[in-house]
Amino acid sequence: MQLNSTEISDLIKQRIEQFEVVSESRNEGTIVAVSDGIIRIHGLADVMQGEMIELPGNRFAIALNLERDSVGAVVMGPYADLAEGVKVKTTGRILEVPVGRGLLGRVVNTLGEPIDGKGPIDNDGYSPIEVIAPGVIERQSVDQPVQTGYKAVDAMIPIGRGQRELIIGDRQTGKTAMAIDAIINQKNSGIKCVYVAIGQKASTIANVVRKLEEHGALANTIVVVATASEAAALQYLAPYSGCSMGEYFRDRGEDSLIVYDDLSKQAVAYRQISLLLKRPPGREAYPGDVFYLHSRLLERASRVNAIYVEKFTKGAVTGKTGSLTALPIIETQAGDVSAFVPTNVISITDGQIFLETDLFNSGLRPAVNPGISVSRVGGAAQTKIIKKLSGGIRTALAQYRELAAFSQFASDLDDATRAQLEHGVRVTELMKQKQYAPMSVAAQAVSIFSAEKGYLKSVELNKVGNFEAALLSFMNSEHAPLMKLINDTGDYSADIEAELKAGLDKFVATQTW
């Protein structure tokens, strides 16, 4: 075979003409240590706090410690195959998650990836998980209610749209049950819900999703999951991820509700990460910024004014306020609300619902302790009729608790004290409510009206529940227009009071309970 020098020359010229100069600039580093989901990287420059670092196999880590000669990052996912010498590179991006209406009815992980087997998500865009909370001028006062469907909560500890109300108690006291019932009660209210499960068993979360679906509330809800078996980084970031998904609706002039179940486990995950990053431990071995961990999250729950919404949507939505209501859950140990994380979250939130083990075990469910449960801003948002009628409920229960303790040592009681005890024990019985059975405003109003106006005096204690069920059935059939009026307006007038009284008198005369 003879080589033609002209052909070779032409071929070389052609290659030279077609040659393109491409320069790629990459900020690349090398892993120098791997341990328990934490990697230490040498050689990276210009890294941002919280920046995503790309690892081999389409995985990412988040830069948390920026030191003089190395970067400490936490791996989001499996890390067993990472070793010293592996090359990694910066992305120049902060972690973002998909947001939009396409996520409603779906179960996603911390990164917004679907894990329910229903195919890809049709999201409207992406939002950073760390967002600065709206400022003072951008906010509006809380004056619209979020109905949980629980008489004990809506009457004594009302929650408003844009409020942060802590649900606190020992394990197995009904904290998750209360939050799930609050979500179920929103299915026809227009409030979009986000349920964030942190560090829970996968079987427990599957049961929650099934219950939401059974009661028709899943279509209105986004479920964000970071199970107990997932990396600590994913458990730490899950609440921020869910919050961004809820803010999507708030910023567009809609109302949303988010449940963090629970922030104790998030704090434990963050403590684990911080100790592995060799940050100095403080009280209970938590890092120094554990307060900021929760405050920057819960401050994002707010009610924003119409100007903020109009500016955010560039004029597409006008005259509408938006809200994100938060129900964080904290698990206490042996009822100790003075521990580090519980006191932090109590000081950040606008009130707390304290659930007690003793009350739960005695059959009072929801096991709300009205003595130390409080809502600091919800009173302004309470429905008119419930606010008007429920004034005596908290007083009756407080007096009953005091007298019940006193009566154990007193041999004989006067008639007034005995009447107060009788009334208190019946109101306590009336506050009991089954799970997955949230009540409408009208049903709550009728129930509380019967207690306030003395209709329970003649009812035997063990028949209070039957009396209430029969009364509500009677009112819904015989006084349907009145019940609809109360549900629609929430007003309380002399005419409504007269009709309620007439209905109750008529029902009591039937003796059908």
Swiss-Prot record:
Upper classification of the organism: Bacteria, Pseudomonadati, Pseudomonadota, Gammaproteobacteria, Alteromonadales
Keyword Cell inner membrane found: yes
Function: Produces ATP from ADP in the presence of a proton gradient across the membrane. The alpha chain is a regulatory subunit.
InterPro entries according to UniProt: ATP_synth_asu-like_sf, ATP_synth_asu_C, ATP_synth_asu_C_sf, ATP_synth_F1_a_nt-bd_dom, ATP_synth_F1_asu, ATPase_a/bsu_AS, ATPase_F1/V1/A1_a/bsu_N, ATPase_F1/V1/A1_a/bsu_N_sf
Membrane topology label: Peripheral membrane protein
Disulfide bonds, paired cysteine numbers: none
Family under the similarity heading: Belongs to the ATPase alpha/beta chains family.
PROSITE patterns per record: ATPASE_ALPHA_BETA
Domain of life: Bacteria
Subcellular location: Cell inner membrane
The name this protein goes by in its record: ATP synthase subunit alpha
One GO CC term on file: proton-transporting ATP synthase complex
Keywords (A to Z) from UniProt: ATP synthesis, ATP-binding, Cell inner membrane, Cell membrane, CF(1), Hydrogen ion transport, Ion transport, Membrane, Nucleotide-binding, Translocase, Transport
Species, as recorded: Shewanella baltica (strain OS155 / ATCC BAA-1091)
EC class (word): translocase
Single Gene Ontology MF annotation: ATP binding
Annotated ATP binding sites: G169, D170, R171, Q172, T173, G174, K175, T176
EC number assigned by the record: 7.1.2.2
PANTHER family per UniProt: ATP SYNTHASE SUBUNIT ALPHA, MITOCHONDRIAL
Catalytic activity from the UniProt record: ATP + H2O + 4 H(+)(in) = ADP + phosphate + 5 H(+)(out)
